[in-house]
Amino acid sequence: MNKPIIALDFQTYEEVETFLAKFSGETLSVKVGMELFYSNGPIIVEKIKQQHHEIFLDLKLHDIPNTVKSAMIGLAKLGVDMVNVHAAGGKKMMEAAREGLEIGSSSGKRPKIIAVTQLTSTSETDMQTEQLIKTSLLESVMHYSNLSKQAGLDGVVCSALEAEDIKQQNGADFLRVTPGIRLASDAADDQIRVVTPEKARLIGSSNIVVGRSITRANDPVEAYNQVLKEWNA
């Protein structure tokens, strides 16, 4: 998934269909999150796959290892390209998630699996006061990144602001998938650690996830092409 990943932050397939129709003939990388998946079920993945788009299924699993392993066996059968878990679930849970994907992938090629470190809506103050983590935000992200690597995962979800440090620690092949991406003209909304596509590229992101800058644009195709231009410059 080398192209910018478009977050399909919709509730219905009709909205998705209308949006994707604007990109007729284009193969996209898209993210299906909780809102869309829980509103429509697995059929939404099948319908998007029929249009030959790459899918990052963003459900952020976080439960006991056996439960996550069983869930991943099921998700692997959907044929998506990438899934994720919360790194806070721990090394054993992440290992179980990877094992579940391997069991459920009949083709022998499992989806990529990445772990959420800290949400891009989380500030250092929030983390320290609400999660009772007394280190810096960067130290927490780096710890979770290292734990994910040890568990055999393919990468992490992180802010672009932490991507270069993670690359240096865990290698260039370890994915740094970064949400919180906005065009310079757009509002940050509820995300705090936000950067532009160009800056994300320059400071070490391997993949970017872009939602509202594209989906809420007056001309989504033009906005996507602008993101693509900045990302590939």
From Swiss-Prot:
Taxonomic classification: Bacteria, Bacillati, Bacillota, Bacilli, Bacillales
Pathway(s) of this molecule: Pyrimidine metabolism; UMP biosynthesis via de novo pathway; UMP from orotate: step 2/2
GO cellular component labels: cytosol
Annotated catalytic residues: K60
UniProt EC number: 4.1.1.23
Residues the record lists as binding substrate: 9, 31, 58-67, 120, 182, 191, 211-212
Classification via InterPro entries: Aldolase_TIM, OMPdecase, OMPdecase_AS, OMPdecase_bac, OMPdeCOase_dom, RibuloseP-bd_barrel
GO molecular function terms noted in the UniProt entry: orotidine-5'-phosphate decarboxylase activity
GO biological process: 'de novo' pyrimidine nucleobase biosynthetic process; 'de novo' UMP biosynthetic process
Family: Belongs to the OMP decarboxylase family. Type 1 subfamily.
One matching Pfam family: OMPdecase
Protein name: Orotidine 5'-phosphate decarboxylase
UniProt function note: Catalyzes the decarboxylation of orotidine 5'-monophosphate (OMP) to uridine 5'-monophosphate (UMP).
Organism whose genome encodes this protein: Listeria monocytogenes serotype 4b (strain CLIP80459)
Gene3D superfamilies: Aldolase class I (3.20.20.70)
Disulfide bonds: none
Keyword Transmembrane helix among record annotations: no
Keywords: Decarboxylase, Lyase, Pyrimidine biosynthesis
Quaternary assembly: Homodimer.
